[in-house]
Amino acid sequence: MRVSWLESKCDTPFANNLSFISSGSSSSSSFTLASTACRNSCLCSSSIFFQVLRRNCSSNCCSISNVDISLSAFSFNRFETSSKMARYNLPCPRSLLAILSPPKCCNSPAISCQLRRCCSGCPSIDLNSSLRISTLERRVLPFSLWVSNRAKFANCSSLQC
C-alpha cells in the first residue's frame, strides 16, 4: 500500500477534523490523509509514492521528507506500520495530519512548536521498528519527532519539559 501525506496549517485542533480518502483496489490502495475543517489551509507537501516533497509554503508549516512507510494493518481509528525511516524534518509539529504517537518518555502535555518535550531517556527507533500512527484519536496532542538518518531521536537529552 502507498500512503500519501498532506499537511496543513490549521487554526483549530486537527485531530477531530480528519478524513480518510482511499482510491484504487483494496489490495493496492493509495490512501490520502486530508483535513476537512482547516480554516487556514496551507498545504505544504505532496507525495510521490513514498517520497513526501515539500512545496513552497509559509515557514511555519510542517514538512516531512524521505519517509518510506508500508502499511501492515489498517483500522478506522489507527493503523500499525512497519517503517523504514530515512529522515524526518518537522520544524513545526503543529497540525500534522498523520502523527506518530510519542514514546512514553515523551508523553507530556507540554509538547508544542517550541519543542518543549520530556525526553529524558528516550529510546532509539530501529529502522524496522513498528510504530503506531494515530489519526482520529481525539485526545492526541501534536508533537515533534526528530529522527536522524539512522532513525534515532536527536538531542533528546537537551530537551526539557
Swiss-Prot record:
Induction details: Was originally thought to be involved in heat shock response, however it was later shown not to be induced by sigma-32 (rpoH).
Species, as recorded: Escherichia coli (strain K12)
Domain of life where this protein originates: Bacteria
Protein name: Uncharacterized protein MbiA
